[in-house]
Amino acid sequence: MIEGFYFFSGRGMDSGTTVYAKNRKTSGLIGRLNLVSHPFCILLIVHFCMKDYSTPFLTRFSRLFKMLLWLFSTVRRIRRLDKASVEQRNAEFSAICAEALSILNVRLIASNRPSESLKGVLVVANHISLLDIFAITALCPSSFIAMKELSRWPVIGRVARNADTVFIDRSNRKDINIINEAICRSLAEGKNVCFFPEARTSSGNGILPFKEALFQSAIDAGSEIQPLALRYFDSQKRRTTQPSFSEVNLFVSLWRIVSMQEIEVHVDFLPLEKPQGDRYEVKDKIEAAIGREVGKIHEVLAE
């Protein structure tokens, strides 16, 4: 839910969305907008009704323009990695994602990061924002498990395919077995594989229930699991949900990110886990560990 707004749509996004505001300045019906034809209108409304005006309007558009250039540059850079080694690919992807975070003025803070590079581990993290993948890849380059719909996104889908992303149809249980086999092969080749067991994004103040299916791959491959806990803070070092991709569309999520003066993403590396027991037991243990870390609320961090 966007601060200051409720979005309602009777017949879906293609038919338009009625937007209401709940603050005094924009009370009542603002208008009926077609999100497909006029996504820019949504961005303007969010801009004028967001509480944080610290980032100039031109700075926001500058960040968006630089991200567009970054995206097309990334497509070219990834094409050159076809014959690269795992180490070379990891180094390049780490650099690519660090550049994206820099453009968006996102500070990456890692805690308890292993001194040696991880190889052949299953990386598991809570999912909050579009920035999660950039943050994780900058620190721990991995192939990602993503929803099948992402493969159809313009440009981004192409980048994801070239980055060895494995796409999954969660409605097809047979597809889960195929994905687990693919993960096992990647782990055996010394590649890291990352997935978000919540299966969707949360606000970031807690975690959603984990799905157990893909934990089977670590058991079958005999690979260790690296749990990661992600938390976001604003320029005042207060916990924030603004970067969250939960319940908003891509345009609004990206606009909220570029509108923040500065973002801090804290990535806590929890102790490596050797899977023991069945996938349900493994899931429960990892879920509890990440949940405890994400649930640590600090209004103001120590300097």
Each predicted region: which residue ranges?
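Short hydrophobic targeting helices and cationic amphipathic motifs
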Residues: 6-8, 15, 29, 35, ...
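A cross-family acyltransferase "interaction/gating" segment
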Residues: 157, 205-284, 300
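Short, low-complexity, charge-dense intrinsically disordered segments
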Residues: 19-31
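Catalytic core of membrane glycerolipid acyltransferases/transacylases, capturing the structured
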Residues: 70-83, 102-104, 117-173
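A transmembrane-helix-recognition feature enriched in membrane-embedded lipid enzymes
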Residues: 47-109, 158-162, 260
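Catalytic-site beta-strand/loop segments enriched in glycine and acidic/polar residues
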Residues: 186-215
